[in-house]
Amino acid sequence: MTTATKDLSSHTPMMRQYLTIKAEFPHTLIFYRMGDFYELFFDDAKKASDLLDISLTARGKTGGNAIPMAGVPYHAAENYLAKLVALGESVAICEQIGDPATSKGPVERKVVRVITPGTVSDEALLVDRQDNLIVAIVDNQSPNAKLKTSSAPAFGLAYLDMASGRFVLTEPQTAEQLQAELQRLSPAELLYSESLQDFSLIEQRKGLRRRPEWEFDLDTAISLLNKQFDTKELTGFGVDDKPLGLAAAGCLFQYVKDTQRTALPHIRAIVCESANKGVVLDAATRRNLELTQNLHGGLDNTLAAILDKSSTPMGSRLLKRWLHFPLRDLTVLNNRQNTVSDIIALDLIAPIQPLLKGLGDIERIVSRIALGSARPRDFARLRHALQQLPELQNELKSGLTESPTNYLATIAQQSQPMPQLEGLLVHAIVENPPVLIRDGGVIAPGYNNELDVLRDLSDGATEFLAQLEQREKERTGIHSLKVGYNRVHGFFIEMSRTAAVDVPDDYIRRQTLKNNERFITEELKQHEEKVLSAQSKFLALEKSLYQELFDKVLPDLAQLQQLSQAIAELDVLTTFAERALALNYVKPSLVEEPGISIDAGRHVVVEQMTNDAFIANPVLLTEQRKMLIITGPNMGGKSTYMRQTALIVLLAHIGCYVPADNATIGLVDRIFTRIGASDDLASGRSTFMVEMTETANILHNATDKSLVLLDEIGRGTSTYDGLSLAWACAEMLALKTKAFTLFATHYFELTLLAGQISTLANVHLDAMEHDDNIVFMHAVQEGAASKSFGLQVAQLAGVPKTVIKRAKQRLSELEQQQTPSILPAPIQNDAFEQLSFAPEEHSVVTTLIDTDINELSPRQALDLLFSLKEQL
């Protein structure tokens, strides 16, 4: 802090206290509790004033300069905290823990928790239908000898969902995989090792936190995690052979412990997430398919926007996780599909969805209970959720059988009622509790005898005061007399100043107002002491009982977490069933054998956005027909056709029904898309460079089990360069990689490849022309397109007629010119064994580089020259 002096003696005692606390949190905003406000000082105040648009004032002086100060009301702090967290700031909450009445100096204060973007659990600070993750990464170039390697994996990554307790590690093999993971997780906060070699991988991420190298120590991480999970080794979690992932997990967990300053009982395990368990989606594919975010950064017109009709927030979050991590496990996928079928067949959608809506967000409520930050209404919501479970079980009974393959039975078993916990919460919490415990009125009557006695004494004050007022009116004859109370002066008897002349001698003046006088009697004073003492004891006891309630719920934590997971999964599968019926989806057949066969497939999003009937189209990719060259006019539907194929394949790999009349989907290992591009100005890359980078990633990483979508490869450069690149890419994918490929192009020359490569076929989207008007048919047909209709599309776009006319003239001239054949000789498979985007050196060049001409005789030099000439 630039404005604080090292010598604290010149400051007031309170400011010395503040500066001491601030020194522990130099990079964190301090919310310093003073009465009914949280105050910020010095640079914190200036920063908060700018970010929150609050007034910047001053308090006292230091070194002759006024101390900047800004503050927010205690009761409205959550709104300001939410804004700061959304902006990536961390805030330390410093509370008064001492009693102002007994404090000789400043009231004792301490930081009770640190709120960071990735560790928040408060309901008001979270988006309810979106995961909020904190991630830690380390690379294999760490100075730590146990982490430093020259081979894959290249990175260790761990992530934690504080609001659910999900703790996961993985080890990305390459920088591309790391970027894909970060895009999938979209962390609110990212911890990274100070030794990270390539900062450009994360520099555009928000919530960056640089951590010292020692926090990634492997031995410390293992010890820390064993202690948390109460184990002697981590073998049972399947992570003991993941040193980089464990190092990242250790750093992350220590950071969370330091910020939360409390036990973390809801973090009960760590899971290893392996890429080979799922369908790999790189960053470009996630973006191009618009899974949860559209190309403009919004949420509209995405796959999630169409599918997510979940009844609970936790179901919505799980659905999005499934979209970003499609699986290759046929057992899991068939379980999901069969459960969707059961829900439809048993007509469970209508009765189940209203019950699910009443369950709320059990997952995050349980997390807040584990962290000790749950509010009274969290307990009330949990109670309400538990009260719905018996009826939910009754509805599921029709789907329960003894068959071990009935996954619906498994879900039902994991969501059994919890009558004891339900009974505890019914007994302990009033029907409609207040927001906070501080004002009391949370614990239900009958829960604790001592509390009931104090409550009766406190509540009886009103009746006593009414009786006293009536007696005093009769005794004094002053009928305007009133008995009242306020927090400053306590109980009093109030009357007009005129009437006060005739008060009895036992009336003691307590306060004089402009028109009234206030008095107290010995009887009223004794009652005041008794009532205030009862109220104080009542509040203290109620807070104590409330804290004990946390401890009583904790033994059920594991079952509650299992319950929340089961309910979330049931919610997603019920949503899949509802969407299947509402949108006319079918159950795809998932098979091990490679291939994609789709009858009358439709685009999930586009068919919901268009007012016209969507034209359904087939897709057939087999071992004998691995690549489709797709031609046709702009706006003809090529990109839509390719995207809908990828989305149908992806939906099948999350266990969802698909928009088609029939579909058989073989398991794929990766989905790649190279569709559309724009300049990456932040990295200084042109559109063509972005296109080639994405293409290179596909050519290096696709396999014969991958689905590849390529749209207009080579369009960003000259015609011949672009055509040559497109041609070579198509040949490599067809002959060497042998991936299932949809290759859209305007280079009609590529259709000639079908005559050379037996596994390649041409399809096209046609259009009809009538009187210079064009009608797009949007129907996929076998064979190559007859023309591109580029001029007609330009005319539709409003290009001036004079330009269109001149273009037609020039087109006619070009078509009449003699164009030499560009069809090369058939290529052999082994031509791609050493394919690289770097130019290969000719053997002549290699020989010349390796030859020392000073050592050659004239005869040897002449022989070498003849030899080199023969190689040309």
Curated annotation (Swiss-Prot):
Transmembrane segments: none annotated. ATP binds at residues 632-639. GO terms for cellular component: cytosol. Gene3D superfamilies: 1.10.1420.10, 6.10.140.430, DNA repair protein MutS, domain I, MutS, connector domain, P-loop containing nucleotide triphosphate hydrolases. It comes from the Bacteria. InterPro entries: DNA_mismatch_repair_MutS (IPR005748), DNA_mismatch_repair_MutS-lik_N (IPR007695), DNA_mismatch_repair_MutS/MSH (IPR017261), DNA_mismatch_repair_MutS_C (IPR000432), DNA_mismatch_repair_MutS_clamp (IPR007861), DNA_mismatch_repair_MutS_core (IPR007696), DNA_mismatch_repair_MutS_N (IPR016151), DNA_mismatch_repair_MutS_sf (IPR036187). SMART domains: MUTSac, MUTSd. Keywords: ATP-binding, DNA damage, DNA repair, DNA-binding, Nucleotide-binding. One of its GO terms (biological process) is mismatch repair. It holds the Pfam family MutS_II. The keyword Mitochondrion does not apply. Disulfide bonds: none annotated. GO terms for molecular function: ATP binding; ATP-dependent DNA damage sensor activity; damaged DNA binding; mismatched DNA binding. Belongs to the DNA mismatch repair MutS family. This protein is involved in the repair of mismatches in DNA. It is possible that it carries out the mismatch recognition step. This protein has a weak ATPase activity. This is DNA mismatch repair protein MutS. It comes from Colwellia psychrerythraea (strain 34H / ATCC BAA-681) (Vibrio psychroerythus). The lineage of its organism: Bacteria, Pseudomonadati, Pseudomonadota, Gammaproteobacteria, Alteromonadales.
